């Protein structure tokens, strides 16, 4: 069994927090991009579209690698049932809390903003269910995927641990070239599965719950397991924390391919399948770029960094309805896209931090948005002197 490191790896905490917080400029730039969203500016911005595409091309792949890393670390710390319970509580409770408090009001607001409130009664029962699935899960989809992955990894992590106990761990080494080939094959495999579903029964791909539970889990599970393997094998982790010009160049070329596919691809042809292959290998190479950068610059402890590490999930959860509110009611009054983008950042981040500070002072909300029980310190119980 792999021992749990005594020293906290601050750069991974920081990277995870920054990836979470990158969701704010990602969604605000989406308003000003050429991509169709719930709310859009009058004229799209080429540079904000490029910025949006860059974040979207790798952010969640790297995030799930870090999630897998910490999940396996906790897997070794707790008994199996307690591990599953702790992990599911920490992602499931915030997700279930955010649905009635955040995404339901967000959905109601959008119904009126987009003029769809009048047509809602005329929808079929399935259309109502599917619309609610997409709109209520919304930006919480990664929490649902983490619940599914944690449940699957009850079996997967047990198999990994049993195989380690019956084999020589020192001989299990992979080069970045070998990992690239593996992830290329995984991307092609995912593309084949998606194309097969598209041929056999295309309507299922527009089903919200199927998309989140099956397709998103299927795509990101290799990154989650890669994170676990990086925790187990120091050599694998070193592949990602050691700067590689090859990975940087390959990631840059893959991003160009991603942009070309976005520009010239067609949803009726092979655009989505091509994107899955590109983003699978791009995500792998960006793990090296992000980890090596973070290991060099973010591997330290500070009160300010710790604050945003702790606040990142809450800020991410509340930023989405704030962003849509800004896009619906404030964006139309700002003619400059870049000024609107900067104002959006100030508006969303400012209010999110205020809400975070308020929720810290309400124990029930603090529990509901973190999934962690509030533990009173012994000093708090001591009588005043």
Swiss-Prot record:
The keyword Transmembrane helix applies. Keywords: Acyltransferase, Cell membrane, Membrane, Transferase, Transmembrane, Transmembrane helix. InterPro entries: Acyl_transf_3_dom, Glucan_succinyl_AcylTrfase, Glucans_biosynth_C. It comes from the Bacteria. One of its GO terms (biological process) is glucan biosynthetic process. Pathway: Glycan metabolism; osmoregulated periplasmic glucan (OPG) biosynthesis. It is an enzyme of class 2 (transferase). One of its GO terms (molecular function) is acyltransferase activity, transferring groups other than amino-acyl groups. It is a multi-pass membrane protein. The keyword Transmembrane helix applies. It is found in: Cell membrane. The chain crosses the membrane at residues 17-37, 60-80, 91-111, 137-157, 173-193, 212-232, 239-259, 274-294, 311-331, 338-358. Its EC number is 2.1.-.-. GO terms for cellular component: plasma membrane. Pfam families: Acyl_transf_3. NCBIfam families: PRK03854.1. HAMAP family: MdoC_OpgC. Belongs to the acyltransferase 3 family. OpgC subfamily. Necessary for the succinyl substitution of periplasmic glucans. Could catalyze the transfer of succinyl residues from the cytoplasmic side of the membrane to the nascent glucan backbones on the periplasmic side of the membrane. This is Glucans biosynthesis protein C. It comes from Escherichia coli O139:H28 (strain E24377A / ETEC). The gene is mdoC.
């Amino acid at each position: 069994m792999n021992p749990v490191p005594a020293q906290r790896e601050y750069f991974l905490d920081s990277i995870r927090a920054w990836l979470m917080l990158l969701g704010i400029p990602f969604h605000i730039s989406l308003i000003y991009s050429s991509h169709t969203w719930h709310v859009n500016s009058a004229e799209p911005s080429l540079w904000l579209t490029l910025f949006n595409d860059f974040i979207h091309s790798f952010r969640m792949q790297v995030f799930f690698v870090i999630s897998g890393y910490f999940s396996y670390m906790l897997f070794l710390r707790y008994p199996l049932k307690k591990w599953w319970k702790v992990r599911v509580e920490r992602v499931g409770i915030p997700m279930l809390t955010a649905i009635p408090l955040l995404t339901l009001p967000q959905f109601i607001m959008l119904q009126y903003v987009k003029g769809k409130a009048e047509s809602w009664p005329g929808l079929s029962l399935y259309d109502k269910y599917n619309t609610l699935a997409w709109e209520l899960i919304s930006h919480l989809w990664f929490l649902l995927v983490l619940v599914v992955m944690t449940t699957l990894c009850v079996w997967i992590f047990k198999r990994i641990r049993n195989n380690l106990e019956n084999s020589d761990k020192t001989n299990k080494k992979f080069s970045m070239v070998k990992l690239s080939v593996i992830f290329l094959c995984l991307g092609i495999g995912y593309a084949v599965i998606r194309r097969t579903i598209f041929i056999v029964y295309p309507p299922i791909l527009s089903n919200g719950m199927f998309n989140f539970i099956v397709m998103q889990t299927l795509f990101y599970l290799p990154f989650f397991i890669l994170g676990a393997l990086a925790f187990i094998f120091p050599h694998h982790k070193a592949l990602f924390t050691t700067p590689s010009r090859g990975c940087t160049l390959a990631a840059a070329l893959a991003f160009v391919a991603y942009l070309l596919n976005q520009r010239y691809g067609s949803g009726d042809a092979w655009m989505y399948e091509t994107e899955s292959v590109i983003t699978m290998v791009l995500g792998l190479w960006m793990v090296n770029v992000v980890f090596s950068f973070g290991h060099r610059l973010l591997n330290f402890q500070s009160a300010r960094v710790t604050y945003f590490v702790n606040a990142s999930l809450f800020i991410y959860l509340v930023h989405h309805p704030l962003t849509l509110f800004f896009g619906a009611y404030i964006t139309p009054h700002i003619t400059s896209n870049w000024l609107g983008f900067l104002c959006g950042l100030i508006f969303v981040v400012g209010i999110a931090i205020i809400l975070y500070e308020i929720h810290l002072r309400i124990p029930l909300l603090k529990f509901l948005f973190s999934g962690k029980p509030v533990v009173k310190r012994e000093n708090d119980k001591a009588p005043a002197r």
